[in-house]
């Protein structure tokens, strides 16, 4: 048998395999070049970028938990202008699609960051993080309010012709409602899930471990929740889905594809093993070869009930 066909496409972004790196776990890409071949993975996603540089939250802001970790980094980043000037030139020379994750604390901020990216060579697409508080609306998170999420998606769509992936929060009553809202507003693809809100407590000090008190839970602990949400959304909307949440090996990734994902993102695994994304792509291909499966795309949504 020939080598399995590992290629997939998400919203017109063609990838050599379904493995993408999750925003905030892979720096700006160059930081991982010593640990894996950047041209062995499907796509790279940048840290979340805002209009202006952001320092993030005070420390401690990461803590290990059973089956995962909590982070309260606070979306620290260099800002969109510094990314374009200092980070993007390196990435343009890597033959792997670069997707820029962006966020804002106001509707206008989302629109402005998207506009800066429009027409930029070297940016294959954008991923919109809607898990941010709307400072003009009392801090309600965009991604928990269907109306607010739609406003963001519509404005970003208006300001850029790049393919747009919208990253969904799991911290909602019904993820399908949010998925449909984003799809109706013009999203080209959906990625899910972002982190679940959690906290850790230091019993001896009787204080929260994180300076921010709460943080985002990621890692294997959230995988069953993520799989369920991908499956639910896949039945409800006709957009390509990217599965995220606790993917540590090739089998995990393929489970997300059976649930309905076209591609996956590897995040927390990269902290434990900086070459995780490349290894997972290799493990997926090996599974297909071992089971005489010709194409990875044949597994998308192939869950049998």
From Swiss-Prot:
The keyword Flavoprotein applies. FMN binds at residues 23, 47-48, 101, 129, 167, 193, 219, 245-246, 267-268. SUPFAM superfamilies: FMN-linked oxidoreductases. GO terms for molecular function: dihydroorotate dehydrogenase (NAD+) activity. Its EC number is 1.3.1.14. One of its GO terms (cellular component) is cytoplasm. Its main location: cytoplasm. The active site is at 132 (nucleophile). Its cofactor is FMN. It catalyses: (S)-dihydroorotate + NAD(+) = orotate + NADH + H(+). Pathway: Pyrimidine metabolism; UMP biosynthesis via de novo pathway; orotate from (S)-dihydroorotate (NAD(+) route): step 1/1. It holds the Pfam family DHO_dh. Heterotetramer of 2 PyrK and 2 PyrD type B subunits. NCBIfam families: PRK07259.1 (NF005574), pyrD_sub1_fam (TIGR01037). Belongs to the dihydroorotate dehydrogenase family. Type 1 subfamily. HAMAP family: DHO_dh_type1 (MF_00224). This is Dihydroorotate dehydrogenase B (NAD(+)), catalytic subunit. It comes from Geobacter sp. (strain M21). The gene is pyrD.
């Amino acid at each position: 048998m020939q080598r399995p066909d590992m290629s997939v496409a998400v919203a017109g972004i063609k990838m050599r395999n379904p493995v993408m790196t999750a925003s905030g776990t892979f720096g700006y890409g160059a930081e991982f070049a010593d640990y894996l071949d950047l041209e062995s993975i499907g796509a790279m996603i940048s840290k979340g970028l805002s209009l202006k540089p952001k320092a993030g939250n005070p420390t401690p802001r990461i803590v290990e938990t059973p089956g995962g970790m909590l982070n309260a980094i606070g979306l620290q980043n260099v800002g969109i202008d510094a990314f374009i000037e200092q980070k993007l030139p390196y990435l343009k020379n890597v033959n792997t699609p670069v997707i820029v994750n962006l966020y804002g604390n106001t509707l206008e901020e989302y629109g402005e960051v998207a506009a800066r990216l429009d027409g930029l060579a070297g940016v294959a697409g954008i991923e919109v993080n809607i898990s941010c508080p709307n400072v003009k609306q009392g801090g309600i998170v965009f991604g928990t309010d269907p109306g607010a999420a739609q406003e963001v998606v519509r404005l970003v769509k208006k300001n850029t012709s790049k393919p747009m992936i919208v990253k969904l929060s799991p911290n909602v009553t019904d993820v399908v409602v949010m998925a449909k809202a984003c799809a109706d507003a013009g999203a080209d693809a959906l990625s899910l899930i972002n982190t679940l809100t959690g906290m850790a407590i230091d019993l001896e000090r009787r204080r929260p471990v994180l300076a921010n008190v709460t943080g985002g839970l990621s890692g294997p602990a959230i995988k069953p929740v993520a799989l369920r949400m991908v499956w639910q959304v896949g039945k409800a909307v006709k957009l390509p889905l990217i599965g995220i949440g606790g993917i540590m090996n090739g089998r995990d990734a393929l489970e997300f594809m059976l649930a309905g994902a076209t591609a996956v993102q590897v995040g927390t695994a990269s902290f434990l093993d900086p070459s995780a994304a490349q290894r997972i792509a290799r493990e997926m291909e090996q599974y297909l070869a071992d089971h005489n499966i010709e194409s990875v795309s044949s597994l998308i949504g192939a869950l049998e009930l």
